[in-house]
Amino acid sequence: MKFFRYFFTLIFLLSFNLFSQENKISKRIYTTKKLVKKPVIDGFINDEAWNVVEWSSDFTQKDPDEGKPPTYQTKFKVMYDAKYLYVAIRAFDDEPEKIERRLSRRDGFQGDRVNVIIDSYHDKRTAFVFTTTAAGVKGEEFASQNGENWDDSWNPIWYTNAKIDDKGWTAEMKIPFSQLRFGKAEEQIWGFNINRTIFRLQERSLWQRIPNDQAGFISEAGELHGLKNLISQKQLEIQPFTVLQYDKYPPEAGNPFRTGKDFRANFGLDAKIGITNDLTLDLTVNPDFGQVEADPGAIALDGFQIFFREQRPFF
């Protein structure tokens, strides 16, 4: 009897394992190539420079009907050179006049948008997320804990543009490698995914399907292949400032400090310097936060503290 019990248990476990493998979503792979000619980042994707790589499409819904084809498809291309990663996106829409195109501040994600998710370390835990809306508003987030935490205070330097046409809307991105972190392998493999949101339909679709019951998000992304001989770019950002103040008023006789006019000058800088691929030096000289956006007024009527986002650049 024990033999048959062990035998049927083994058959059950093997069957369950085979069932799990059959239902596992296979990883999608996009193979990029090094560009021959640099594209102009103007939002139009008809530049000949994009012809060196192929389109990839076949997005699937994430919300509201996970796994089903989206209402409108999306396709993209990726290529690179020594310093930048380039992404072109075509977001189809049969009703372009209904595309939600909202102008907002940076990181304002209201409206139709696409998110390019790059796990450049391929640690399947963290990712850099670059977002552009149909209005060309850009935003960025740093995702950690396998997609459990999203930090939108990260503000790298990169370039994007978007245009609306009779087929929907298009976008181009130019992302400096200096804003990413990656290993030293001769040929890189990065985690990669693209998320599209159609605002009026409250619909999200992904290039690499990730079922809603799947644990993890970054770890389930597709893969970007073909990145060869990348050289880590040292990050160097310098943001100087100068503040001039001139006051004019009636002079006071006998007062050498009230001559009728005052002139003041103040200057300083913020800097971000890449020491190594894993270490960045942030420094400030004579910081002046007079131009920083003030926190909005708020009154707490409950027992919870109010959290305000840090607006000062250095912090």
Region locations from a protein language model:
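Hydrophobic h-region of N-terminal signal peptides that target proteins for export
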Residues: 10-20
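Sec-dependent signal peptide recognition
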Residues: 2-10
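Structural preference for beta-rich elements and adjacent junctions enriched in aromatics
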Residues: 21-315
